């Protein structure tokens, strides 16, 4: 009888495992996670936790946001918190350290809400995690260094929170990491050495400073790079070796010097360098890339609000959306640009606030309705009405630049 009483807790435990099918440890962790979070909405239709009934026979099949392994006791392998629906305000509360008890977890996702507090450092014990996505909430504190010890981590997205501190230098040691999205936080310091096989890096809209990592420390595999809206400075020559880039956004920083010719190629179809301190001419593309000037549909290049000089080359003719305004370009607009505008291949061409002297209009041929062309505040009278009908409000109301400014500028450049 005494032996039976001693074994009774174990019998009950095994019975619970068999009945519910899920690991008791995982079930307890899910209970703690639910207790630390709450649905913002009071409507059961949009509420996430409505299905989390802990008396249910099999939470693995009835709980929203979880998937489990097949074998009993079932273990939670993915956890998605929130519905992710556009009409759902999401969750509030904090992330419970109990998440770390889900030792078989491979994916952890938190959808948009107002979850606050730090990211639990204990997440670093979940060695099978490949995806961490905790976006669009109000998470605070620094990025736990323990995250960068996860040997299988492929994707890390902590964007649109209120994270502070620096990016841990140990990020460079995580060779499995391919996607890092930390944009729209309050992260400061310099960009550390990055994993050698990184494909996607978004650090936009933070408080980062310093220069980009040296040329031999940049991942040659990078295809997407965005560091816009920081306090970064220095030359762009470190990007010359990044031949796999298809998207580049360095806008709203303090980068200086000339633009490497290797960046002007058709495969880099989205390039945003606006609002920096860039100087010099737009170079011809490298001779080693014969198709470099063939930009196709969907291509965008924004070099506006810099100090670029000289006459326009044919390098960017054919770009679908092209912003060259607020620079110091001179001379006549090349005919290739004009042909591209009239054919509708270039749908947006902003050249306002330069020192351009001529735009060779095709007499009697109207612009396509889909084209937005702005030529105001240059050293010419824009063709009427082509040159200013599609100008943004920021272009101002002056049609041409004052003659004395044009004369003084041409004299200084001679």
PLM segments and residue spans:
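The feature encodes a structural signal of leucine-rich repeats
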Residues: 92-100, 119-121, 140-145, 164-169, ...
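A generic tandem-repeat structural signature
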Residues: 97-215
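C-terminal capping segment of individual leucine-rich repeats
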Residues: 101, 125, 135, 149, ...
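Surface-exposed cap/linker segments adjacent to membranes
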Residues: 2-65
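Consensus "Asn ladder" position of solenoid repeat domains
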Residues: 113, 134-137, 158-161, 182-185, ...
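LRR flanking "cap" motifs
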Residues: 38-94, 384-388, 403, 410-411
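Membrane-proximal ectodomain caps of single-pass cell-surface receptors
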Residues: 30, 79, 223, 242-247, ...
